[in-house]
Design a protein with these regions (language model features):
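Hydrophobic, aromatic-rich transmembrane alpha-helices
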Residues: 3-17, 53, 211-229, 265
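Hydrophobic transmembrane alpha-helices and their immediate junctions
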Residues: 67-69, 180-186, 207-243
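A membrane-periplasm/extracellular boundary helix in multi-pass inner-membrane enzymes
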Residues: 38, 59-140, 158-162
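Transmembrane alpha-helices of multi-pass inner-membrane enzymes
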Residues: 52, 236-248, 252-280
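Membrane-interface helix-loop-helix junctions at transmembrane boundaries of multi-pass membrane enzymes
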Residues: 12-27, 60-70, 174, 221-238
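Aromatic-anchored segments of alpha-helical transmembrane domains
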Residues: 30-37, 78-84, 240-249
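Long extracytoplasmic/lumenal interhelical loops at the membrane interface
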Residues: 138-208
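Alpha-helical transmembrane segments of multi-pass inner-membrane proteins
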Residues: 1-62
Length: 280
């Protein structure tokens, strides 16, 4: 969902000539999606927020010079966001979209203020992932899911170090060993197919060690330098920062569709460029 939003927004900026359509599409679509992403994927939620922040920073002058239009945009986006919370609040959030009759009815009976409070209450456990703390040489989180992933990522580093594989990694012929650790059952998931660690960067490091990780960083740095040399700006960050942030917290890059779409679109943009600023 996050990548579809980002790609479609950039396509709109490139090909749709109407500045009003572009700016309303970007913010209203975000207003619709953010309540859903709060529950579905914290990484995707933050990715969309980062996209909005970067886009807004590039267009501060437009907002300053169009106060009336900015006020209308904020009002419409806010209304859409609130209405979207009703849909989310009436949905059984279990990564499938099953609508319970009682839940929908309960959500419908809430006022706007009560509904937002209900969303905030449900989101308290999601906010816990920000509650990180350090103890006995390791980082922990009060949020169970985040703590589970932090445990895996740190186990990868410790295991690589103990086996003197920091420089070359595990290779590609086996499941990352910490995923099959008998002292931490459940890491492979219910279907036993959970071979990776839900972090793009840790996966790269685990498979090829520091050497591969440095090559990866140099590759992506070279993309930014090529873009800067060709277009004399850093607007590519509108795509790369949200995607990399999301991939550092979630399993997005461990599938097939997400990386294919991302890298094909990245190549397309490098070849053709795009303009991030809305003309005044």
């Amino acid at each position: 969902i996050m990548l579809t939003y980002v790609v479609s927004s950039i396509f709109s900026l490139k090909y749709v000539k109407s500045k009003n359509f572009n700016i309303y599409y970007i913010y209203i679509a975000a207003g619709i999606l953010l309540p859903l992403l709060i529950f579905m994927s914290r990484g995707s939620f933050m990715g969309v927020l980062l996209f909005l922040v970067i886009f807004s920073l590039y267009n501060l002058s437009f907002f300053r010079l169009n106060v009336k239009k900015t006020f209308i945009l904020i009002a419409i986006t806010g209304i859409v966001f609130v209405l979207s919370t009703y849909n989310v609040n009436g949905t059984e959030i279990n990564y499938s979209f099953n609508f319970g009759e009682e839940e929908v009815q309960a959500g419908a009976n809430l006022s706007i203020t009560e509904n937002i409070k209900e969303i905030a209450r449900k989101d308290e456990q999601r906010n816990a992932f920000l509650s990180l703390y350090y103890d006995n040489g390791r980082i922990y989180s009060l949020d169970q899911t985040t703590n589970w992933r932090l445990d895996i990522w740190q186990d990868v580093v410790e295991d690589l170090n103990s086996k003197s594989l920091i420089f070359k990694g595990y290779g590609y012929n086996e499941i990352i060993p910490v995923m099959t650790d008998p002292s931490a059952p459940g890491r492979l998931g219910r279907d036993g197919l959970n071979e990776h660690v839900h972090n793009y960067f840790v996966n790269i490091f685990a498979r090829g060690g520091i050497f591969q990780f440095l090559l990866f960083m140099l590759f992506h740095l070279s993309i930014i330098l090529i873009w800067k040399r060709k277009y004399n700006n850093y607007t590519l960050f509108l795509l790369t920062i949200p995607v990399y942030f999301t991939s550092g917290l979630d399993m997005s890059m461990e599938g097939v569709q997400f990386p294919i779409v991302f890298y094909l679109f990245l190549a397309f943009l490098i070849q053709n460029g795009f303009e991030i600023k809305i003309k005044k």
